[in-house]
From Swiss-Prot:
Pfam families: Peripla_BP_6 (PF13458). It comes from Brucella abortus (strain 2308). Residues 1-21 form the signal peptide. It comes from the Bacteria. Component of an amino-acid transport system. Belongs to the leucine-binding protein family. PANTHER family: LEUCINE-SPECIFIC-BINDING PROTEIN, PERIPLASMIC BINDING PROTEIN OF ABC TRANSPORTER FOR NATURAL AMINO ACIDS. This is Leu/Ile/Val-binding protein homolog 6. GO terms for biological process: amino acid transport.
Length: 390
């Protein structure tokens, strides 16, 4: 069955590349229902915002976006949907991918299908190494977890305990922070990996207290797990006792801040994007993306990965004249530079990963009572340290 599917991809690729397309289809795979539907909603908001600003035409070609739903990580379903999009729908580009396993599962079909993949979220460093046709416009966990180590040391914190959820991104975050923190003279006194299903954090908080650490580095999936952890951090007296919390920005993404509330105030994170980022490009983007998403409080970081992903895809379509040519499309965006809503960015010509600023943010409360990530420091032109660690 696998051989038949790949043969179909190859035949379709030859037929589709023989002529110019009047309509160029982009297949977007992501979670548009289920527990992670808000992330898919952000994908769509970013795509809609880009097309509202730039139209749906590139030269003589009309761009059409075709969506497919993978409610939660499901590599087999993701691969099957990607094959269906390429063979039956005739998409020339694959994009989206909130979960790393879903992105990894699709990489083997890119060459046979003659299609590039633009990763709009999935944050494991090694995805770009699986195929020369992968380009990333999001971030990696290593990229956002490394600078916070410097922040902790600058705050006088020499001993930290690491607490992460025990799955791929959590392990990446733990390793990234530990490498940067210990290389600069800090000590990770203990590294705790919690099962994803953990909902009682009191024993973890006691271990943190007993460790003698001055600070906590934490990485957890957004939503209920983060809410429970943050509540326990406050309720068990860690915040009031001065044990500082450091994390990548997933912990305080904007769509979670209303639920986190006062518990998140003062938390320091490093991340590639905040909705509050102060620039003309971001103000314009946020205006359009909020229209697209409907509820302004739901806008969060996956939207900017999708917005910039469409910018890269439009450049690919322009470079290929609407023809199906994955190698030429990817070559055209190597070294590409532009000013994104998040700030200045570029596509590294070697890794095809996005180089970008990483911002230190502190959760603050606005005059209207809403919570936001206030940017207070910039780490410029950050690549992906995770690629060197492979």
């Amino acid at each position: 069955m696998k051989k038949i599917a790949l043969t179909a991809l190859a035949v379709f690729s030859l037929a589709a590349s023989a002529a110019y397309a009047d309509v160029v289809k982009v297949g977007v795979i992501g979670p548009f229902s289920g527990p992670f539907a808000l992330q898919g909603k952000n994908f769509k908001a970013g795509i809609d915002a880009y097309m509202a600003e730039h139209g749906n035409k590139v030269g003589d070609d009309t761009v059409e976006v075709v969506y497919r739903d993978v409610p939660q990580a499901d590599p087999a379903q993701s691969k099957a949907l990607a094959q269906e999009l390429v063979v039956k729908e005739g998409v020339q580009y694959l994009a989206g991918f909130y979960f790393t396993p879903d992105a990894m599962a699709v990489t083997p079909i890119l060459k046979q299908g003659n299609v590039p993949m633009v990763v709009m979220n999935a944050a494991t460093s090694s995805i770009v190494t699986k195929s020369p046709y992968v380009v990333r416009t999001s971030f990696t966990t290593w990229q956002t977890s490394t600078p916070i180590a410097r922040v902790a040391l600058d705050k006088g914190v020499k001993k930290v305990i690491s607490v992460v959820s025990d799955y791929g991104p959590g392990v990446d975050a733990e390793n990234a922070f530990k490498a940067a923190f210990t290389d600069a003279g800090g000590e990770v006194v203990e590294a705790i990996r919690m099962p994803l299903a953990t909902n009682d954090f009191s024993p973890i908080m006691q271990r943190i207290k007993d460790s003698g650490a001055q600070g906590v580095f934490a990485f957890l999936p957004s939503g209920p797990t983060t809410f429970g952890f943050m509540k326990a951090y406050v309720d068990n007296g860690l915040k009031s006792s001065g044990i500082q919390l450091f994390a990548p920005g997933d912990l305080t993404q904007e769509s979670d801040l209303p639920a986190l509330g006062e518990n998140a105030l003062g938390v320091l994170t490093t991340f590639h994007y905040a909705v509050s980022h102060d620039s003309p490009e971001n103000r314009k983007f946020v205006e359009e993306a909020r229209k697209a998403i409907g509820n302004p409080a739901e806008l969060s970081f996956p939207s900017v990965g999708a917005y910039d992903g469409m910018h890269v895809i439009y450049k690919m379509i322009e470079a290929t004249g609407g023809k199906k040519d994955a190698a030429k499309a990817v070559e055209a965006v190597k070294g590409m530079e532009w000013v994104s809503p998040r700030g200045p960015v570029s596509i590294d010509p070697e890794s095809r990963h996005i180089t970008q600023n990483i911002y230190l943010r502190e959760v603050a409360k606005a005059d209207d009572g809403t919570y936001y990530n206030k940017e207070i420091q910039t780490f410029e032109k950050q690549g992906d340290p995770g690629l060197k660690a492979q």
